Design a protein with these regions (language model features):
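Bacterial extracytoplasmic/cell-wall-associated proteins, especially those involved in peptidoglycan
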Residues: 1-154
Length: 154
C-alpha cells in the first residue's frame, strides 16, 4: 500500500498503467524498462503529454470494434487512443499479472522516452526522437528478415 501511495497513482490508474505494461512487454525483465518509459513520459508531460502506446489502440480494434460493427463512436476511440489523448486511457486494456503491477510501482531508472519492438520481441529504447527513428529502422530490418514490411504493433 505504501508503494502505491508513494507512486501518485490511484488504484484505478495503477490497474490501467499495469495493463499497458503487461501488453507492451515481451518478458518480465522488459516490464521494468517499459514501465520506466511510461513513467518518464508521465513525469515530463509538458514535453511528452501522450503515452503513445500501440497496445491501447490495438485494444480498440481487437476487442472494442467488433461490438460496434465497424462503427466505433469517436468518444470511445478518444478514450483509448494514447497517440491522441494525454495521459492514461480511460480503462485497463488487459488483465495485468503481478509482475506488471510490481514493475508499474518499481520501474527501472532509465533516461528513455521511447521504445519500439521487433517481431522477435526485442525492445529498442531511445532517449530522443532521433534515437527512436533509428531504432525503428533497426526493428524494420529484423522484421524484413521474416518478410514483414514495417512494424508489428502490440
Amino acid at each position: 500500500r505504501a508503494a502505491l501511495a508513494d507512486s501518485g497513482f490511484t488504484l484505478e490508474q495503477w490497474v490501467i498503467f499495469a495493463s499497458i505494461v503487461q501488453k507492451e512487454s515481451a518478458s518480465v525483465e522488459e516490464m521494468y524498462n517499459v514501465s520506466s518509459v511510461f513513467h518518464n513520459r508521465l513525469s515530463n508531460a509538458s514535453e511528452y503529454p501522450m503515452l503513445q502506446s500501440c497496445t491501447t489502440n490495438n485494444f480498440i480494434w481487437d476487442y472494442v470494434e467488433p461490438y460496434y460493427n465497424d462503427n466505433v463512436p469517436q468518444a470511445v476511440l478518444d478514450a483509448y487512443d494514447t497517440y491522441d489523448r494525454n495521459g492514461l486511457p480511460i480503462g485497463a486494456i488487459a488483465n495485468a499479472g503481478l509482475d506488471a503491477f510490481d514493475a508499474s510501482l518499481h520501474p527501472n531508472d532509465t533516461p528513455y522516452y521511447f521504445f519500439v519492438t521487433d517481431v522477435e520481441r526485442t525492445h529498442y529504447y531511445g532517449r530522443t526522437y532521433q534515437e527512436h527513428l533509428a531504432n525503428i529502422e533497426k526493428a524494420k530490418a529484423v522484421n524484413a528478415k521474416y518478410g514483414i514490411n514495417g512494424l508489428v504493433t502490440g
